[in-house]
Amino acid sequence: FPSAACGVVGLKPTWGRVSRYGVLALAESLDHIGPMVRCSADAGIMLQAIAGLDPDDPTSLPDPVPDMLEGIEQGVRGLRIGLDEKYISDNTDPELTASVLSGIRTLEGLGAEIVSIKMPDISGYMEAWGVLCSSEALAAHEETYPSRRDDYGPWFQAWLDNGALVTGAEYAKANNVRSACRGLLNNIFQDVDIICCPAMTSPPF
């Protein structure tokens, strides 16, 4: 989302692929570190540089870091792209939808295969995200909030205050919703290599 809002290329790596050591946390189980760059090749170069096991971050993955630029010149022939036209157009700026569809058709012309998919309704998942993120953010900022409340902006104050209202049962239910969402998306990825959709519903700011 930050990259889309700025009109640049962003890459959100697998959780744990990049160390979060030294980063001001928002939500422990949701935070990712990734490059914001000019183009896809730059994203690969940056990820190659920052990925890998970090002894200072026990959640960082021990898996070997592959060559992030391998195959970048091979084209997209045979790539299976999942597309839900209703999903990318509902409540989305028409110009943005048209731009996404144009990009997909370009990839199709280069040999990619477009596969019709049905994305799940994300409204319930976004509600669960709010429960998880706000409560984890409160935990991450417990040393400075609310003791230094005035150092926080009004929006983030409200976000943390909402997190303080979350019960253990509500957090557990939200985590179950997250697991269900992950399962649904994993099933979709059994048939496609990528899902093509806008990162947000409006053009860059």
Regions found by a protein language model. Name each.
Residues 9-98, 103, 121:
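A short helix-breaking turn/cap at a secondary-structure junction
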Residues 1-10:
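FAD-binding core of FAD-dependent oxidoreductases
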Residues 94-96, 125-135, 205:
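Short glycine/threonine-rich loop-to-helix capping motif typified by GTGT followed
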Residues 34, 193-195:
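Short, Asp-centered acidic motifs that coordinate Mg2+ and/or phosphate
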Residues 112-129, 160-161:
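Short connector loops at secondary-structure junctions
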